[in-house]
Amino acid sequence: NDTLTVQVQNNKTWRDYIGVHFGTPKITVYLPEREYAMLTVHENTGNVEIPKDFAFTGADISVTTGNVRFFADVQDAKIKTSTGDIQVEDLSTGSLDLSVTTGKIMVSGVTCQGDVALSVSTGKTALTDITCRNLRSNGTTGTISLERVLADEAISVERSTGDVRFNGCDAAELSVKTGTGNVTGSLLTEKI
């Protein structure tokens, strides 16, 4: 059914974990450069990197502990990690939904036809050179910096604790809420 499934099954007993061990398992999957339908990755511990040579109609990536680096064009992407960083660069997308419990979100060079949604419980968010319809970011603890972020409709940022920094950003509507933190920066047009 044109589906590639890769699984690692651990058949070790507790005795296999006694002693000094070097190295961790690593899986590299090579595919022809072309557009694929859905990319689904569910990983407990490990890093995931998707290079720019691919295109997908959808991507659903979930990692418990590890970093995700995503560079491929995708129609709709949902990337989540509990502990780790998410890096998205130089791609076109229909929608982008990124979520980190503890870690950083770094997005740069993204053209999004729809909405960008970002959620960070604890960690920094850095957004650079993004165009989209709407951008929504919420978080508990951590600084968010937006540089040259342009939204056709709205930019909404909420933080419990942390600074919000704008540099050369704009949207028809702008909403910023922070419990403890400073809001600084520059917008391209005046807001009331």
Place the predicted regions along the sequence by residue.
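Acidic (Asp/Glu) and glycine-rich low-complexity loops/linkers
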Residues: N1-V63, N67-T81, D85-V100, K104-V120, ...
